[in-house]
């Protein structure tokens, strides 16, 4: 029986996320990696996003990657167009290692 123990603090889910970015015109992929805690906002406005895409078809805040204890989900923001593995998604989507995400003209390949 513990009586004087401090309350247990719940830590936020976090994990390494690696994305390989390529554009329609680009030949090579660009590697982007970060230790993501809780969420990652993707968009075209560097002041509002964690990952900024220089893409005229990307909204200032386009989508959010959410890290949860049981995986990673992707959610479009404000009905923005997002595709995963060639199919449009209309809401929250559970991502798998190797999934391909299309935002505007930019393709992102996910490595977990």
What are these model-predicted stretches?
Residues 1-56, 66-68, 95, 102, ...:
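Intrinsically disordered, low-complexity acidic Ser/Thr-rich regulatory segments
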């Amino acid at each position: 029986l513990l009586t004087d123990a401090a309350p247990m603090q719940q830590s936020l889910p976090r994990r390494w996320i690696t994305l390989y970015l390529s554009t329609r015109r680009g030949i090579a992929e660009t590697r982007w990696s970060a230790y993501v805690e809780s969420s990652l906002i993707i968009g075209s406005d560097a002041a509002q996003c964690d990952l900024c895409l220089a893409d005229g078809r990307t909204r200032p805040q386009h989508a959010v990657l959410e890290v949860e204890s049981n995986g990673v989900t992707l959610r479009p923001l404000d009905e923005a167009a997002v595709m995963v593995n060639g199919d449009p998604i209309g809401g929250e989507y559970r991502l798998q290692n190797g999934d391909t995400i299309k935002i505007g003209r930019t393709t992102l390949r996910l490595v977990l």
